[in-house]
Amino acid sequence: MAKAKKKGATLFKVVSTEGTGFFYLVCRNLKNKQEKYSFRKYDPVVRKHVLFKEAKLNK
């Protein structure tokens, strides 16, 4: 089943800094966190954990 739409929550794309083009989609509440997301996650293209940074989601 699909997730329920949260009020005030927005969908964002976090892109690998390795330049592979791999990305994750993240839903976050803008009222709680104003700063941009950046965290380490697994990039299957380079097969290691790398830093991912927030980017705009093109609709």
Swiss-Prot record:
Native organism taxonomy: Bacteria, Pseudomonadati, Pseudomonadota, Alphaproteobacteria, Rickettsiales
| Protein name (Swiss-Prot/TrEMBL) | Large ribosomal subunit protein bL33
Protein family (similarity comment):
Belongs to the bacterial ribosomal protein bL33 family.
Q: What are the protein's UniProt keywords?
A: Ribonucleoprotein, Ribosomal protein
Q: Which GO terms describe its molecular function?
A: structural constituent of ribosome
**What's the superkingdom here?**
Bacteria
Which Gene3D superfamilies does the record cross-reference, listed alphabetically?
A: Ribosomal protein L33
NCBIfam families given in the database record: PRK00595.1, rpmG_bact
Q: Name one GO biological process term.
A: translation
What stretches pass through the bilayer?
none
InterPro entries named in the record: Ribosomal_bL33, Ribosomal_bL33_sf, Ribosomal_zn-bd
Q: What are the GO cellular component annotations? A: cytoplasm; large ribosomal subunit
